[in-house]
Design a protein with these regions (language model features):
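Phosphate-binding loop of NTP-binding sites
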Residues: 98-174
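N-terminal leader/targeting and accessory segments in enzymes
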Residues: 1-103, 107
């Protein structure tokens, strides 16, 4: 299933192309990944930073793994030799990768017009509550619920982006 295209991601999040071959072709994307260890061919890879990691360091693995699009905010992470080794790469530079991920999730949420969203908040028991709501709704409806304890900014965006356009519900942990 095509998630979006590289061009539609750029339209949703902004940014400028560091590499785009061929310049006017549509690159279909099958989903989103923030981890090269679980990246599947055709997914867009968002190079996020954390306290102890910088996913920009893993661009060679993302490109070798078949990322259909790479979203970065540090252009030095895509040096000329990496560009030469991956001539078909689509690399989008944005001011902030996390903000771009949030923008994409917000744009995608607007496309889920027929999907009811349920947000579960609180200090304890969110994941269990999400699982219970999903188990009940799944008996009669088609939907998506957060896969893990995705109750932070990144996890919420990934949960929204994992929904299918045909879903009747989306259960998020906030």
């Amino acid at each position: 299933m095509t998630f979006w295209t590289a061009n539609s991601v750029r339209a949703a999040v902004g940014g400028s192309w560091l590499a785009r071959v061929p310049a006017n072709a549509e690159i279909p994307l099958t989903g989103i990944s923030t981890d090269t260890r679980t990246l599947q061919r055709g997914q867009a890879f968002f190079a996020l930073r954390g306290e102890r990691f910088d996913a920009h360091d893993f661009l060679p693995q993302a490109l070798a793994g078949g990322a259909g699009l790479v979203v970065i905010d540090d252009p030095s992470a895509f040096p000329p030799e990496l560009a030469r080794n991956h001539p078909g790469a689509a690399v989008l530079r944005v001011p902030d990768v996390l903000e771009a991920l949030d923008r994409l999730a917000a744009a995608y949420r607007k496309k889920l017009a027929g999907t009811r969203v349920i947000a579960v908040t609180g200090s304890n028991g969110k994941t269990t509550t999400v699982r219970l709501i999903d188990a009940i709704l799944r008996t009669r409806l088609k939907g998506t619920a957060s896969v893990k304890s995705f109750n932070n900014q990144i996890g919420l965006a990934l949960t929204v982006l994992s929904a299918k356009p045909s879903d009747q519900y989306l259960v998020c942990e906030v």
